[in-house]
Amino acid sequence: MPILQVIVLAVVQGLTEFLPISSTAHLYLTSWLLGWQIEGLDFDIALHIGTLLAVLIFFARDWLQIIAQGFGIRREGDRELNHNHMLLWLLLIGTVPVGIAGLLFNKQAEGAWRNPFVMGFMLIVVGVLMWIAENAGRQQRDLSSLDLADTLAIGTAQALAVVPGTSRSGVTITAGLFRSLTRESAARFSFLLSTPAIGAAAAKAIWDMHKKGGGLHGMLHADFLVGVAVSAITGCIVIAWFLHYLRRNGLRPFVYYRILFGIIVLALAFIRRPA
């Protein structure tokens, strides 16, 4: 794969994985419109590892505190996390629905559903739900008050992200708003919840490569390393910017973008069918 293509797609992944606008749709449609082929599991692994590194690096202190408190070890840190010692177990429970959905619908997600008609439809539907949540949610709670019901609701929403065009961050932030979390807390929990899911996706891709006769040594080439680095750096920048943005701003620009982008995707799908 040409290095320019690697960089462009890795930037697209890093930008769109953590914004509520669907990384899958943007990667697929960028490649489709530019006539590029995303070849090989190694590149898919690179993007997954890059975005996994982004959340692990950015939330490293949070994860250390969450894990320590989950095992009864007192660790001073973030105020919200200090008041919720069950967060580790809530995050693990919240990951179960997407794991089940991935096992049940992986073939559809990688096959029949991966087309611009499905993506355009889901971009619009989740955009409308995000608009409703933005206006209906009370946005009064933070992570200190998160409970099992919240986790199950947000975790179940994350399971919908197996459908391309949904956006993992978009649907989980929307669910968080419906549970009356503040925008920033909903996004923060969304990113923390994404960590096990992204890690599992990377592990599955590595296992699939192993079954096809590949190995880790085959991934350690320039394209792979550039893809990991670019998507990780871009992802860290986007997470920092987005959390800062949500402290004072709402999600309406992303709602409008999703709906407009969804309409454009559907229009292009009718005009020009993908190969």
UniProtKB/Swiss-Prot annotation:
It holds the Pfam family BacA. It catalyses: di-trans,octa-cis-undecaprenyl diphosphate + H2O = di-trans,octa-cis-undecaprenyl phosphate + phosphate + H(+). It is found in: Cell inner membrane. Keywords: Antibiotic resistance, Cell inner membrane, Cell membrane, Cell shape, Cell wall biogenesis/degradation, Hydrolase, Membrane, Peptidoglycan synthesis, Transmembrane, Transmembrane helix. HAMAP family: Undec_diphosphatase. Bacitracin is thought to be involved in the inhibition of peptidoglycan synthesis by sequestering undecaprenyl diphosphate, thereby reducing the pool of lipid carrier available. Catalyzes the dephosphorylation of undecaprenyl diphosphate (UPP). Confers resistance to bacitracin. This is Undecaprenyl-diphosphatase. It comes from Solibacter usitatus (strain Ellin6076).
